[in-house]
Amino acid sequence: MTHSLRVIFAGTPEFAAAALAAIHEAGFPVPLVLTQPDRPAGRGMKLQASAVKRYALEHGITVAQPPSLRRAGKHPAEAAAALDLLHATPHDVMVVAAYGLLLPQEVLDLPRYGCINIHASLLPRWRGAAPIHRAIEAGDAETGVTLMQMDAGLDTGAMLHDARVAIAPDDTTATLHDKLAAAGATLIVDALVELERAGALAATPQPDDGITYAEKIGKHEAALDWRKPATVLARQVRAFDPFPGGAGTLDGVTLKLWAADAMPARGDAAPGTIVDAGADGVVIACGEGALRVTQLQKPGGKRLPAREFLAGAPLAVGQRFSPPDTAA
């Protein structure tokens, strides 16, 4: 089936690529895709295209990669060229998903139907850069995807559609990301079909109650504070997979801790102390309860199940992980 609604798409990572693919495969014309410039990545730090760019090029869609869209920003010439391209590209609506660049009012005002953002939370909870991570870290039972009519604020626009997604007890950011990407892809296609048919989408202002902000994840957050309850640390480990991972420093060596679950305390060992180390996992005393780590990684190594890790790097009962403020 083909559609007449013309969609400019702006996005960068896999979450956005899933939406672009759904829009394209549903038959909506996509005359232009905006995505971030190629970035160095991997061990060789070679320039790599974004997931959105890869999809667009594979399907013959024109791609633009301005470093900024702000005429008065650090890249005025590139921004002006991109804005000229937007003005010259006939379109009806812009769909934005994890683009990573600020859209100035000039861009928001350009499409006939404005700009629709696909946000990976149930707004107004978890506005901001890392909604998936923060939902798991906070112990939320569910999250979801919200389609929002973009305005000048940070995820403050009126809500158009949403879809709820349960957070499973073993969900990591990686697994939940994929569920939300699929939900967002379905949601945006349904909304575009409705927009094309009806000429408008019902918009509901975000409530003032329940607003929270999902701050960007920093590498420093990987360090586990063993004084916290094990339930909190288990959520942190799941929330920070695949980035930045959980981390603990043992005898001056920082280990990545990739999978863990909370369990009752064993004895009265000080927080950070290993109280058991076997095939079922490495059990570490916490401020409340204990954390059983079942997947570990040493510097330069691979993620390994506890059994395999211990075969090559034995850990002993009584060893103690350093508190994060003294690990350096």
UniProtKB/Swiss-Prot annotation:
InterPro entries tied to this protein: Fmt, Formyl_trans_C, Formyl_trans_C_sf, Formyl_transf_N, Formyl_transf_N_sf, Formyl_transferase-like_C_sf, GART_AS, Met-tRNA-FMT_C
Enzyme class: transferase
Catalytic reactions on record: L-methionyl-tRNA(fMet) + (6R)-10-formyltetrahydrofolate = N-formyl-L-methionyl-tRNA(fMet) + (6S)-5,6,7,8-tetrahydrofolate + H(+)
EC number: 2.1.2.9
GO cellular component: cytosol
Pfam families on file: Formyl_trans_C, Formyl_trans_N
This protein's record includes keyword tRNA-binding: no
Keywords assigned: Protein biosynthesis, Transferase
CDD domains to which the protein is assigned, alphabetical: FMT_core_Met-tRNA-FMT_N, Met_tRNA_FMT_C
Binding site for (6S)-5,6,7,8-tetrahydrofolate: 121-124
GO molecular function annotation: methionyl-tRNA formyltransferase activity
UniProt family annotation: Belongs to the Fmt family.
Alphabetized NCBIfam families for the sequence: fmt
PANTHER family xref list: METHIONYL-TRNA FORMYLTRANSFERASE (PTHR11138), METHIONYL-TRNA FORMYLTRANSFERASE, MITOCHONDRIAL (PTHR11138:SF5)
Entry function: Attaches a formyl group to the free amino group of methionyl-tRNA(fMet). The formyl group appears to play a dual role in the initiator identity of N-formylmethionyl-tRNA by promoting its recognition by IF2 and preventing the misappropriation of this tRNA by the elongation apparatus.
Protein name in UniProt: Methionyl-tRNA formyltransferase
Organism ancestry: Bacteria, Pseudomonadati, Pseudomonadota, Betaproteobacteria, Burkholderiales
